[in-house]
Amino acid sequence: ITVNDFPSNDLQFDAPIVDHQQLEKILATPQTFDTSAMINGDELAYVLFTSGTTGSPKGVEVSHDNFMTFVDWMLSDEFKIKEHANFLGQPPYSFDLSNMYWLPALLPGGTIKALPHEVVENFGQMFTALPNLDLEVFVGTPSFADMLMLSPAFNQQKMPSLKTFLFCGEELTVKTAKGLHQRFPDAKIFNTYGPTETTVAVSEIEITPEIIENNDRLPVGYAKPGVKLSIWNGDQEITTPGEQGEIVISGNSVARGYMNNPEKTAKSFFKIDGVPAYRTGDAGTLDSDGLLHHKGRMDFQIKLHGYRIELDEVRASLEKSPLIKQAVAVPKYNKDGKVTHLIAYVIPNESTEDTAGLTKQIRESLDGLIMPYMMPTQFVYRES
């Protein structure tokens, strides 16, 4: 479905295009619906795959009830999203952050201004397109916002209708939040937190200039209705405010488990007093008033451009190449503590001085065997 807002005639689509006029005609046509196959709330709504340590991603089963409690929360007064708003639709549908814009936009009569991959990959075209989209709600990762701030035109003067920023998927740094407040002084910036296993996000907080001024790392918010956030040390809940441990999430946002994987489901999903709960593997603290602070991972998992990645899965995927004897993946961090890219340290099956050629061959040999966002951007070769 298109609203013909992109200033280009070169975009190619391999699917039928329905414009606004055609859509109105379709919706005005009476339809007969079969109500004999009703959907129950605990039935499967969608499956999203996340990284796994063995090289086999885990399929997270999210129910209709899970999803609707999230959407109802997004449309509540907490986020103050108005009806008929224009949402930026940049995160792909394979990324659960996309659920933060498609139903929250469409249910109250809003419009999704989707950025095709070709536009995102072409900075000049993207920077030209954005000020012409009349955007009101930004949904994306902090990394994407950092990219947009490379353009001088990404500011309140050029985009006066953009009043709401919704972030999830990776850490929102003080630097990014401060830059956005300088560019969009009248906008509201919301930081949210939640793994795929708990349906997109389970906590939120509006990041004000005062919060930026008083924190080295920004908090990730208070629990949504129907959810309890707690901090655990092993199998014991920590009740002392400010003490660090593993973040455990319980309540109506917790997914059904991992598809066809009862062993991993039993390891991460459990019940607290009969209520579904999930061990996140994230380290965190809770203030006395329930404000959650995320302190990073407790294992070898990272966030890269919003995607959750098991470093051991990257290793296992790399070692599927017949050119690699042994490999290890190492994240590269910037001064703000965010992962910028992955470095692969590789022992090749055969020594060569043409490392650039070997890297090209390895990439080609892994085509279809590793997700593009998991492919290291730098390869370093060792003899042992």
Task: List PLM regions with ranges.
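ATP-dependent adenylate-forming carboxylate-activation enzymes
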Residues: D5-P7, G110-L133, V139-M147, E171-L172, ...
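Short, well-ordered beta-strand segments
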Residues: A45, E61, M68, N86-L88, ...
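Gly/Ser/Thr-rich phosphate-binding loop
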Residues: L107-G110, L135-V139, M149-P219, K228, ...
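Conserved AMP-binding/adenylation subdomain of ANL enzymes
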Residues: K58-L88, D96-E136
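Conserved AMP-binding
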Residues: L44, P91-F95, E118, S143, ...
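Conserved S/T- and glycine-rich ATP-binding loop of Class I adenylate-forming
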Residues: L44, T50-T53, F87, Y93, ...
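AMP-dependent adenylate-forming
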Residues: I1-A37, F67, F138, K188-N191, ...
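Conserved pre-ATP/AMP-binding loop-to-beta segment of ANL
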Residues: Q31-F49, S56, I81-F87, Y93
